[in-house]
Amino acid sequence: MVVASAASPCESSALFATFDHDGDGRISAAELRLCMKTTLGEEVSDEEAGQLVASVDADGDGLLCEAEFVRLVQAAEVEEEDERRGTGLREAFGMYEMEGEGCITPTSLRRMLRRLGSDQDIDDCRAMICRFDLNGDGVLSFDEFKIMMNA
């Protein structure tokens, strides 16, 4: 869920001021919800806005000070980057997973490697898969593929 993006402290302060409609130095869940709708075009329920506030509300007052708001924005940016990375990994996984089985087999790995100009035999492909095959089933699931790509 996108909250906002602020690259510098000045931008963070300006963004905080935009979200702080009543100018009291705190952002309520209602202000957060309203600003997410009007500024970002993102609909969130009262409950979701409350959960967002609670996720970074260090002092437990139900409101966000500027530092808490900055933490919320930073967390949203990390989440967004993780989503982008996950989409890219899913697409890459799909290139190797050619047999419609939802996993990368030694055969599908060999096919893709050949397309990329590498002439690995099936035993080499089994050995590559074995290094990241955590459950020992002889194939790579998407989760195992993610681990391999992040290694």
Swiss-Prot record:
GO terms for molecular function: calcium ion binding. Residues 14-42, 44-79, 84-119, 120-151 form the EF-hand domain. The keyword Transcription regulation does not apply. Ca(2+) 1 binds at residues 20, 22, 24, 26, 31. Keywords: Calcium, Metal-binding, Repeat. SMART domains: EFh (SM00054). Ca(2+) 2 binds at residues 57, 59, 61, 68. InterPro entries: EF-hand-dom_pair (IPR011992), EF_Hand_1_Ca_BS (IPR018247), EF_hand_dom (IPR002048), EF_hand_pair_protein_CML-like (IPR039647). PROSITE patterns: EF_HAND_1, EF_HAND_2. Pfam families: EF-hand_7 (PF13499). Ca(2+) 3 binds at residues 133, 135, 137, 144. PANTHER family: EF-HAND CALCIUM-BINDING DOMAIN CONTAINING PROTEIN. Potential calcium sensor. This is Probable calcium-binding protein CML31. It comes from Oryza sativa subsp. japonica. The lineage of its organism: Eukaryota, Viridiplantae, Streptophyta, Embryophyta, Tracheophyta.
